[in-house]
Swiss-Prot record:
It comes from the Bacteria. This is 6,7-dimethyl-8-ribityllumazine synthase. Keywords: Riboflavin biosynthesis, Transferase. It comes from Synechococcus sp. (strain CC9902). Pathway: Cofactor biosynthesis; riboflavin biosynthesis; riboflavin from 2-hydroxy-3-oxobutyl phosphate and 5-amino-6-(D-ribitylamino)uracil: step 1/2. PANTHER family: 6,7-DIMETHYL-8-RIBITYLLUMAZINE SYNTHASE (PTHR21058:SF0), 6,7-DIMETHYL-8-RIBITYLLUMAZINE SYNTHASE DMRL SYNTHASE LUMAZINE SYNTHASE (PTHR21058). It holds the Pfam family DMRL_synthase. Disulfide bonds: none annotated.
Length: 162
């Protein structure tokens, strides 16, 4: 029996793409900061001259799937993290945006076999979003951990030709 697991020690050489929604940037900037901090602390060189981490900004969560797909098709990235914040309003717009964003991002994962981390907050209020992107609990950190684990896991499986 073979057991495959992601290994954080083997993740510092991963090429990581991050796609960030500019809408609700008060939140998404905090998520990105937590994400970058986690990557640094796990040995990923996030300096711009190293080209280990690339960041693309899009207008909103609805645009995340397209740019994620374009990044994935380059085959440069071992894993891609999507970051966004969709906060419920008084209209059905919230439901449409999050439905299309989540389906689109999932489709990219299936079509490319590149792990895509779904880091899009869906909250009822700005306060809930701030709590999830804050100092005590920044989900951006967790999304980066997922990326390191999934990137190293997929690479291990490729080496074993599973």
């Amino acid at each position: 029996m073979t057991v495959f697991e992601g290994n954080f020690e083997n993740s510092k050489d991963l090429n990581i793409g991050i796609v960030v929604s500019r809408f609700n940037d008060l939140i998404t900037n905090k998520l990105l900061s937590g994400c970058i901090d986690c990557l640094k602390r796990h040995g990923v060189n996030v300096e711009t001259n190293e080209n280990k981490v690339d960041i693309a900004w899009v207008p909103g969560a609805y645009e995340l799937p397209l740019i994620t797909q374009l990044m994935a098709r380059t085959k440069k990235y071992d894993v891609i993290i999507t970051l966004g914040a969709v906060i419920r309003g008084d209209t059905p717009h919230f439901d449409v945006v999050i439905s299309e964003a989540s389906k689109g991002i999932a489709s990219v994962t299936r079509d490319t076999s590149i792990p895509i981390i779904f880091g899009v907050l869906t909250t009822d209020t700005m306060q809930q979003a701030l709590e999830r992107a804050g100092i005590k609990n920044n989900l951006g950190w967790g999304y980066a951990l997922q990326a390191l684990e999934m990137g190293s896991l997929v690479n291990a499986m490729k080496i074993s030709k599973v």
